[in-house]
């Protein structure tokens, strides 16, 4: 399967932060049998971001995005993904309730930027963030998979790794031509 990694955020293009996520994800995907054919970085511009996502969905089976899930004005990744897929962008009430509990436990006021974190592409499978507010998601559409994840490298490498390994275990079982059962060891390797 062909994979593409897209990192979002103008701060990457300005050189303000290091793009560790692409390197780590490329290594992980290649270890799990994917061919990472493209890595793209796009700034916080909704039209360019939507265009990049559309192009990726045409040429890759699995598209993983990194960034743009937080509670700031610049976090437009989820909306651009929904536009690229031609699917509605909707509020997930159960995610809003989880977020309200999360912010309340820290005594933080519930405001519009936090509410935006509860919006996802219609039909998305949420991957709750157990160590923060921004959840990731998986969107399966017309045989393609668009995966959105956190920008923070420590969340990706630790909390998210288990979820990602479970996701790839499922994909490996259903993406092989013989459709045979596969096993995943504690390091995520399949046989």
Which functions belong to the PLM regions below?
Residues 161-171:
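Hydrophobic, low-acid, alpha-helix-prone terminal segments
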Residues 1-39:
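Glycine-rich phosphate/diphosphate-binding loop of Rossmann-like nucleotide-binding domains
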Residues 76-157:
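Proline/glycine-rich low-complexity loops and linkers
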Residues 38-48:
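Short beta->alpha junction loops
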Residues 10-11, 68-71, 151-152:
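Short glycine-rich anion-binding loops that position phosphate/pyrophosphate groups of nucleotides
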Residues 158, 172-178, 184-186, 190:
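Short linear motifs in low-complexity or flexible loops
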Residues 60:
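An anion/phosphate-binding loop that grips the pyrophosphate of nucleotide cofactors and donors
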């Amino acid at each position: 399967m062909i994979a593409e990694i897209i990192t979002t955020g103008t701060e990457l293009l300005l050189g303000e932060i290091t793009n560790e996520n692409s390197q780590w994800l490329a290594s992980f995907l290649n270890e799990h049998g994917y061919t990472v054919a493209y890595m793209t970085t796009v700034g916080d511009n909704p039209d360019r971001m939507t265009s990049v996502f559309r192009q990726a969905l045409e040429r890759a089976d699995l598209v993983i995005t990194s960034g743009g899930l937080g509670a700031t004005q610049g976090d437009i990744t989820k909306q651009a993904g929904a536009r690229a897929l031609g699917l509605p962008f909707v509020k997930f009430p159960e995610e809003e309730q989880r977020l309200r509990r999360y912010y309340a436990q820290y005594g933080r006021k519930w405001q519009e930027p936090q509410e935006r974190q509860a919006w996802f592409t219609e039909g998305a499978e949420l991957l709750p963030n157990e160590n923060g507010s921004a959840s990731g998601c998986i969107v399966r559409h017309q045989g393609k998979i668009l995966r959105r994840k956190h920008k923070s490298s420590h969340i990706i490498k630790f909390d998210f790794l288990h979820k990602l390994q479970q996701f790839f275990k499922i994909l490996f079982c259903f993406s092989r031509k013989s459709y045979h059962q596969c096993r995943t060891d504690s390091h995520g390797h399949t046989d």
